[in-house]
Amino acid sequence: MILKYDVIVIGGGHAGCEAATAAANMGARTCLVTMDMNKIAQMSCNPAIGGIAKGQIVREIDALGGQMGLVTDKTAIQFRMLNRSKGPAVWSPRAQCDRGKFIWEWRSVLDNTPNLDIWQDQAEELLVEQAPSAVPSAASSAVPSVATESQQTRQVVGVKTIWGAELRAKSVIITAGTFLNGLMHIGRKQVPGGRIAEPAVLHFTESIARHGISYARMKTGTPVRIDRRSVHFEDMEVQPGENDYHQFSYMGAHRVLPQLPCWTCNTTPETHEILRSGLADSPLYNGQIQSTGPRYCPSIETKLVTFPDRQQHPLFLEPEGTDTNEMYLNGFSSSMPMEIQLEALRRIPALRDVRVYRPGYAIEYDYFDPTQLSHTLESKVISGLFFAGQVNGTTGYEEAGGQGTVAGINAALHCTGNQTFIMHRDDSYIGVLIDDLVTKGVDEPYRMFTSRAEYRILLRQDNADERLTEKAYQLGLATRERYDWWLQKKENIKRIVDFCNNTTVKPKQINGFLEAIGTATLHGSVKIADLIARPQINFSNLSEQLPALKEILHAAENRQEETAEAAEIHLKYKGYIERERVFAEKMHKLENIRIKGKFDYATINDLSTECRQKLERIQPETLAQASRIPGVSPSDINVLLVLLNK
């Protein structure tokens, strides 16, 4: 049987769901291939969305017209804004979600998306045909040129499934998560699988690799799941959420589900003693697992080996939902034998009678070298083939969702031969993520942090719609309703900012308040904007002194708190924002200098050997991208500039 589509998405995880809905909403006839329709967007590890830098990515997905933020708002059972003690550049929203409801909300989104079909099956073979070779870029006679490996001599035409169905399309997006040749480990026991009790996808990696696309192995893991009825909560510390819930979606609803607390406790020396006794059977330390795991989410056994003098490690017990007794023990990822895990847990006072639903386990899986991709996430080797999510060497639902959105957009554009959509380092964390992947590559699972972004003050969680919604609307991904919401918010912010810039405050109106909060009093009239710039002053306390300010802050019909927050940040940090924007614009000049196809790097002796090798392999699109490749020095960039100017 042959089924014809514009776009085929392989895998129904977070990358696949965002990719499928993005492509379909742009008008492409799309088919999402998944092994289990009842595990759409499964939270395979912790039941939470957002976190440091990750929350910004969710806001960006939403601003582009994606779905993760909307689904999170409908299923959140606890909210926290992380990094509140620091500046707004690094504030990051995070929500615990009801795992089961999260799946069904996503399933509802897919079922109600026009142009989108779901096919329950397993991909086995990538279908590829020869394509006309790309025409080499014209080069100056003074600059050596070479035909690069990035020229696509083949094009994807579809996939074949294990049941013999042939799905044909102009674009195929691979979002297979940890399922490609997945191998799970608990102690010395090894079982093929992509997730606990779910089969691995065999042979599909090889069908891709035979076309010249290289791959390697990575490892990840997940903790034990605990029965809440067996926990002694009196021996734990409660960790409630925050009341001022900030919706992830700019169009999201207010809290729907009842809010649940998390709980904290610590491991004990007795716990550590039992875990150490089982290290000989740990697949991480007996040679069973050779691949690299995530640096920033180590297993409990790795913590013991790395920090042997620590007497305790913090653990966080997180609810999985409102109607289940299953709880997630954050901080206790492990692949130790089952009996070791259970005995170690029972040496923690709060878990002395613990019962578990399933033990922690590790999983090894295939990923593809992301330097083989362009910034659209399309393969440099096979036209129309896109990759997104953990198959690119990343870790995290949010990183996957961001890549899926970009891949879905570009897969749809590829079908019509239209322009490509590229996100940049100064317009989004997604842009930082993709640029890091395709420029630097990965040798361990990649996780996003605010420290990876050089333009953090521009990439705040409060202004993702300002950065991206108009672009998404022009693409046809963001709806008119979403765009109108942004225009309304934009107008409300402008009204507040203009009021503060134009309204004068006299000393007699405000000096008593200023003295009470410990800041300098006024000797003459000043604008409200000048007062807001002071660290002790914010809209909340100042509006209590100035009724006219309170009135304009409350004038917005929707999302008053977030609108006021965005306006306050604009006023407080105006100088920093402008300075960073000027620097970003300077870097854009290098982004506009295209070098792809203009050099035979192997013949440029003035470049270092490492630089020549890296440039030959990665084939950067622009001079700016070349400057970010590890091993390419500023002097190497100057050599290329001299050659370009000849």
What is each stretch, according to the model?
Residues T21-E125, W163, T175-R195, P199, ...:
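Conserved N-terminal/central alpha/beta ligand/cofactor-binding core
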Residues L127-P132, P144-A165:
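Conserved beta-strand-loop-beta-strand element in the redox core of flavoprotein oxidoreductases
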